[in-house]
């Protein structure tokens, strides 16, 4: 009988929701498309981001040590908090050409951890930030091969029609963003929200593959309910956010 596979430690990572208000109302978020040569979800649309590097801890940010830790709800050390903010800004520059001179302008939006069953795992902090005035993001044609501004609700509609490939955390994040009507609303909510690490749990529930999130009655550990707690696979193999049963 084979021994159970050891759980792979997650790699620290950061991703950024670059936001801009639209002249006709509402707002858009910038997304990039993975290369078809990518080892994970080739062709999927994602938010700019990547792994935290050791040298990220050496770069300054305009926040005190106390403010840094508060930004992450006390979940990270000062050095790790700084590394994640700097990594977020660096990845945006590398993938889109947009320079965020002050990483402290970004606020924590969510925190996702790849399930333990996966062989490649990431511990990713999602940040929300306003696109600098007059910035013109693009894509590097290497790691990402296309890019576009999308209304969150429109992106969800395109996903539902099979026109857009999204990973579950990206889908859930777009669903979360679609609740707001402006960049100010998103950033105000990010400043005020209590972020809990989301480590999805895959189960078959009532004959459907289901992703359980913290707060769900079937989730393996007790956590506060911060929103819908289930993402259920529907027709065409696409995921849909649903509220957990009472």
Functional labels for PLM-detected ranges:
Residues 1-246:
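N-terminal leader/linker segments that precede catalytic domains of diphosphate-processing enzymes
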């Amino acid at each position: 009988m084979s021994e159970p596979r050891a759980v792979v430690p997650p790699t620290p990572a950061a991703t950024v929701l670059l936001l801009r208000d639209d002249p006709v109302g509402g707002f858009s978020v910038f997304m990039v498309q993975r290369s078809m040569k990518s080892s994970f979800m080739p062709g999927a649309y994602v938010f700019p981001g990547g792994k935290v590097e050791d040298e990220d801890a050496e770069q300054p940010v305009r926040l005190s040590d106390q403010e840094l830790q508060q930004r992450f709800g006390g979940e990270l050390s000062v050095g790790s908090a700084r590394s994640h903010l700097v990594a977020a800004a660096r990845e945006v520059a590398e993938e889109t050409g947009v320079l965020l001179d002050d990483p402290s302008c970004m606020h924590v939006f969510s925190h996702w951890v790849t399930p333990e069953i996966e062989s490649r795992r990431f511990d990713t902090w999602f940040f929300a930030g306003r696109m600098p005035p007059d910035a013109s993001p693009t894509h590097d044609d290497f790691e990402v091969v296309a890019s576009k501004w999308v209304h969150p609700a429109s992106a969800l509609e395109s996903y539902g029609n099979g026109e857009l490939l999204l990973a579950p955390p990206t889908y859930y994040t777009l669903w979360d963003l679609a609740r707001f009507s402006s960049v100010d609303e998103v950033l105000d909510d990010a400043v005020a929200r209590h972020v809990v690490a989301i480590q999805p749990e895959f189960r078959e529930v009532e004959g459907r593959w289901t992703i359980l999130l913290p707060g769900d009655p079937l989730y393996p550990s007790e956590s506060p309910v911060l929103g819908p707690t289930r993402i259920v696979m529907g027709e065409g193999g696409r995921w849909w956010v649903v509220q957990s049963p009472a």
